[in-house]
Amino acid sequence: MVELTLPGPADVLAAAARIAAHATVTPVLRSRAMDALSGAHLHFKAEHLQRGGAFKFRGACNAVWALDEAQARHGVVTHSSGNHGAALALAAQSRGIPCHVVVPEGAVAAKLASIARHGATLWRCAPTQAAREAECARVQRDTGAVLVHPYADARVIAGQGTATLELLRQAGTALDVVVVPAGGGGLASGTLLALQQAAPGCELVLAEPAGAADTARSLAAGRRLVDFVPDTVCDGLRGALGEPNFALLHGKATAITVDDAATVAAMRLLWQVLKQVVEPSSATVLAAVLAQPARFAGRNVGLVLSGGNVDLDALPWMRA
């Protein structure tokens, strides 16, 4: 795992200033129908409308623009199932530097197309963490590119936290709780830092697929438990919780696991009621709130809709 100095709340503020000229300030959406369904006051942070179609542009942009000129000259490299790769490609394009993305077999076609569209070089590998990291290391050796890890990178973590900084300003009321999807932990740990900076009394809840529930198990056990084979429709949440991400989150967040049926049902609601094209990973946050209505009843809840890169020919409710 990548070794790094853990970022702090002030790093989120620095990231916000660094990416201000490049990232979109996405809207916060409200719906009376959604409030009635949930029994809570829901504030949806629409990161699926971010550049690249996902929150991950924030972290990638912060990482790319934090490089000095000598580092930037050789470009950047990462491994990604889609959204982070597309985000890094777009961020690298904004600075005019090379980008290499290692992609596992079976990645969503729409996400691969987004990576390629922004000029990155794609390198294929087997769909395992070991294969991803080995191919990344090879590309680094051959090109001199700087590794920008999808979630275990201080610059990325800080950048992801800027979405919640915006959410807190835009909500128009003090939020009681913020719910974000949990995969590798970049968004989750960045959100924690943002809350520590701007709303220390706000609760952080992580929404996670039951078929890839390593974050929930790790937080409950007090140590990383990442020996699992993911089985979930949420392709963006299949990665294992990172070491630095766990170090930040341990003892400071709780997790709710939701099965794929609940996630797909929540995704349909977001499409039909909120009129937003989001991917399954985004829908976990609404599924989590609906799974525990008593916990959220009457509360002001921020939900980060993490991305909207979907394959329209393979929507989850179309499967036999």
Feature annotation, model-predicted:
Residues 1-320:
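PLP-dependent amino-acid enzyme catalytic core
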